[in-house]
Amino acid sequence: MVVQMDIYDLMKQVNEWVKEILQDNYVGVYFHGSLRLGSFNPNKSDLDFIIVVKEKIDNEIKQLIWDKMLENEQLFPKKGFEFSVVLEDNCRNIKHPIPYELHGSRDWIERYKEDKTIVINDDYKVDPDLASHFNVINVPNDKMDFGKPSKEVFSKVPKEYIIDSNYSDTLDCVEEIVNNPVYCILNLCRFYALIRDDLTLSKYDGGKWALENMNSNYNDVIKNAMEDYLSDTNNSYDNTRLKEFAQEAISLINDCVDTNKIRK
């Protein structure tokens, strides 16, 4: 059962849990994703955040963090939570893929319950997605930062890292767009906005941008995806047009990558 809770109250609560566990090792909690970019839908979005620490954390602390999130799972949005714990030094001195201490998400809950050592261990871990998450955190939004201001913690992420972080997921949309049209349509739009105009946009705002900057023959497809994203509607989509849109978007993206000689 999901208990509806004001999202800002939940953010404050998450921060308090983390501070209590980390004590002097706490730097801050930084929310990213659709919430930071202004298109959060509690029925379709998860709560994304990065926990930053001064020093490495041991397995006992890792388990305390995971157990606290599970203990309060019912307070999170329907899609749950996704978080990573990262050393402050790895937020300032960025290398790609970015190392992390701990990861947690709804997709990892069952494996955590079955065998904690799969999730909690001393292995060296890296995540290419963190470059994209850090880039979103660099979009100013003081309401999303708890602890030290994000501008004092996170360095600017090189564009080639951000592109590499998103590129394979974007390519997958060619095959996945029929099964997951809303996500793929809007993700292709916002990634093209990033590649072409260096814009960091939410999925919804990526759709708005595409209505003015991409082939208008697909405006109805994009509008349907935007409507479905922010509401409980389920528009129907023509599979052939979906695939054509994906192929055209990928072609535009690749042209920009090649023109700017961006490593992918």
Curated annotation (Swiss-Prot):
GO terms for molecular function: nucleotidyltransferase activity. Keywords: Plasmid, Transferase. The gene is aadA. It comes from Campylobacter jejuni. It holds the Pfam family AadA_C. It comes from the Bacteria. Probably a nucleotidyltransferase, it does not confer spectinomycin or streptomyin resistance in situ or in E.coli. This is Probable nucleotidyltransferase. Its EC number is 2.7.7.-. Disruption phenotype: No change in spectinomycin or streptomycin resistance. InterPro entries: AadA_C, NT_sf, Polymerase_NTP_transf_dom.
